[in-house]
Amino acid sequence: FPPNTAQRWTLANGMTLIVQEDRSAPVASVQAWCATGSTTEDKHLGAGLSHILEHMLFKGTKTRSTNEIAQKIQDVGGYINAYTSFDRTVFWIDVPKEGALTALDILADAMMNSTLPPQEYAKEQEVIRREFAMGMDDPDRTMTHLLFATAYQRHPYRLPVIGLIDIYNQLTQEQVMEYYKRRYVPNNLTFIVVGDIVLAEVREKLENLFKDQPAK
């Protein structure tokens, strides 16, 4: 493995930044890690709040529609994806190096300014219901859920990340928005950028994007 030359620092609002220059290929990966997952859903434990929020964060912000977000990523030749786990939700955009700052802009916008449009929420509710149905038809997934439910009878690990369908069906868009505002805050976020980038440019961009975002 190449030597680890990553630099890490923390902004005044508590957000962590990790950046590493790597010139081995003309690409970059821009990631946002939020320290929130299925075990941090408090009174909504088992509802899959973190998972549906993962689906919703690129469905529109205060300044961009879902189509505009998708078009911006396409324009720079990027690939966007995300996943939810027990204790984290991770979003990433892989781009040619020229698109790194654009990817940062879009990710920061989604982390801080998502609007979770009700019409998009209704669509994603159905998408996730289909995920539930597919999971029920998957013996490996069923076995994993049963294993965790047996091994962690009191700990939140006993519940699947996607949630339980009966609790999930009770969720409202307003509850998801409240969770988003509470958990997606600078002091709960880590931005990671690795690739053929200029560290000073990335740092300046991130500091400017989050300079008006206070810790909560």
Predicted regions: what is each one?
Residues 3, 26, 87-88:
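Short acidic/glycine-enriched loop/turn segments that link adjacent beta-strands
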Residues 1-13:
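Beta-lactamase-like hydrolase cores
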Residues 4-5, 28, 178:
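Residue-level marker for the onset of beta-strands and adjacent loop->beta junctions
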Residues 14, 22-73:
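Active/ligand-binding-proximal structured segments within catalytic/core domains
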Residues 10, 15, 21, 66-216:
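Charge-rich, well-structured scaffold segments of protease-associated domains
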